[in-house]
Amino acid sequence: MERTQSSIQQIQPPTYGNLVTILSIDGGGIRGIIPATIIAFLESQLQELDGEDARLADYFDVISGTSTGGLVTAMLTAPDNNNRPLFSAKEIKPFYMEHCPKIFPQHSGIGGTTLAKLVRSMGGPKYDGKYLHGLVREKLGDIRLHETLTNVVIPTFDIKSMQPVVFSSYQVKKSTILDAKLSDICISTSAAPTYLPAYNFSNQDSEGNLHEFNLIDGGVCANNPTLVSMNDVTKQIIKENPDFFSIKPMEYGRFLIISIGTGTAKNEEKFNAAMAAKWGLLDWLTHSGTTPLIDIFSQSSADMVDFHLSALTQALRSQDNYLRIQDDTLTGTNSSVDIATKENLEKLCQIGENLLKKPVSRVNLENGLCEPLKDGITNEDALKRLVKMGNFHTVM
């Protein structure tokens, strides 16, 4: 819908005195429904301030996402024919409910047994990705990275060059080879090993030089892309980007960060050393319906980002500018990235709603554990507080 004179305006560069605002969304397959629930609430609060046309892309300098979070990022920032976001935040949850069962079709009968799943995993990825690829291309069309309505950061990993490839709005200005179609970027960052096939595509730079990408899920290097986003902004400050000229490279008190996880099964403690000591290669790759090695790498990288940012913001006494929303109490099928039954998807929706009511948690730097704050403020209240911060919204 076209914007009217009373509708909100895209946030001004931080040189106008505003905070550098970052929204970051973890990877996690179908568990992307959890952050989808959180951001729907966040956008509704912004709409209470600035009207129903308000969208998250109008308020954040950077929106970043890995894997399923990368898909959400594209949906929030890709322009429609009126140059407004293709999706509102509240439309993402129904999108997941409709399409996840087709992206991750569940086998029944003999085909759904553990043995059958194991045999299939030996012959290739668990899912062929055809429905996902077609869906993403249909929704995003030929929209390219430089066209997003705010800056985006989406990590992937190139298995040919063996290094991360970060598709960033900031980097595309100097490296046009990264100006790929959003559909190609989303398919790449979602290509989780063992679940979906690796993805290959080529792109031309402004001089006509062709570059080939051989990409898999960004979760193998940055399942929590918050720090990648902050690094991108910091590089712009060092390069004296005029949007950031009044901000010093280490002035992290000027950052406002909302980082949303997709849930973990930490509290379930489903693995232990006695169990893993008996594992061979196969067990490390797939064990009792899980993928231990992949889960460990993605979770450890996400937690290290949270630990680093918690330590940094607490040292600078700006911890109230960093909100990490995560649920470590998932169990059973709720912690799966691909069990896309109606029952499980509905449960994940409820987990997201419940997470809003849970107290804000922060890393205890003494023991590394995430602990609820003593003041009892909920994630819902914390989001409301951030929305009402004076520099967070601008109105025409």
Show which residues each predicted segment covers.
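Conserved catalytic cores and adjacent C-terminal regulatory segments
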Residues: 2-396
